[in-house]
Regions:
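Acidic carboxylate diad motif detector
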Residues: 1-80, 221
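Positively charged, helix-rich recognition surfaces that bind polyanionic ligands
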Residues: 84-247
Length: 247
């Protein structure tokens, strides 16, 4: 809002949120007193009316084995792609695992496209994280999506199960690569006792790009914010200072 008032942000791009669609879905959030986990299964609480209508049937969701010893504080059930899939998020406290590092050793990161992350230390070491695999996945997704959308439009449909399956697979593959990239960078810092990570960032760097239609498409669709948030989370876990420097 401050940028809108100062004229630095286009006022046409700022609007009030839309109302939820008539048959739209919303996330179900279970707090501590509503979480019931027995025998590695989460039982979703239901109303009496629902239980009568479905003959007492209960929805039970398997809990990952790695969460057995964790104290789960919140569970979020998020509908995806119009309720075709559901994403389950378990929120729990992660015990810190501080490692021996030197605050004088710094790793600078420049995020990009072909070079997903260009990393250099103040001790003279440098390395690149390849981003071409992400571009390839995104290019294939755009090509397939355009074809499936044209078929769906001829049939009077906005989306189809095949489109949702395609998007789900693409998102999983992208997130997997970004997580592994963040893990590699943090492991490098641990091995070299680097105590500070400085990541270049510009809040509005994706707005008004003029790098060509194809490059703009790749750059805006690849979630660099997910990579930054994963890096920040891992740094907090291992006691590494994470900073973002405006470019």
């Amino acid at each position: 809002l401050q940028k809108v008032k100062s004229g630095d942000y286009g006022s046409k791009a700022v609007r009030l949120p839309y109302y939820r669609e008539k048959r739209g879905l919303f996330s179900l959030i279970l707090s501590t007193n509503a979480i019931n986990i027995k025998n590695s299964f989460l039982t979703v609480p239901m109303s009496r009316e629902y239980a009568k209508r479905h003959n007492g049937h209960r929805i039970r969701i398997p809990v990952p084995d790695r969460l057995k010893d964790k104290t789960i504080q919140e569970v979020r059930i998020c509908p995806m792609y119009g309720g075709r899939y559901f994403k389950i998020q378990y929120c729990y406290l992660q015990d810190p695992e501080p490692v021996k590092t030197s605050p004088d050793r710094v790793l600078a990161i420049d995020l990009g496209l072909d070079n997903l992350a260009a990393c250099v230390t103040n001790t003279g070491t440098s390395f690149l994280m390849d981003g071409r695999k992400l571009k390839s996945i995104n290019q294939y997704w755009n090509k397939r999506k355009a074809r499936l959308q044209s078929i769906a439009a001829k049939q009077g449909q906005k989306t189809t199960n095949q489109l949702c399956q395609l998007a789900k697979k693409r998102n999983f593959r992208m997130q997997d690569i970004l997580r592994k990239t963040a893990r590699y960078i943090v492991n490098f810092c641990i091995d070299h006792r680097i105590g500070t990570i400085v990541c270049g960032y510009n809040r509005d760097f994706k707005r008004g790009l003029k790098l060509g239609k194809v490059t703009n498409q790749h750059f805006t669709q690849i979630s660099l914010s997910y990579l930054r948030s994963t890096l920040k989370h891992l740094c907090e876990r291992y006691g590494i200072t994470y900073l973002e420097q405006e470019e």
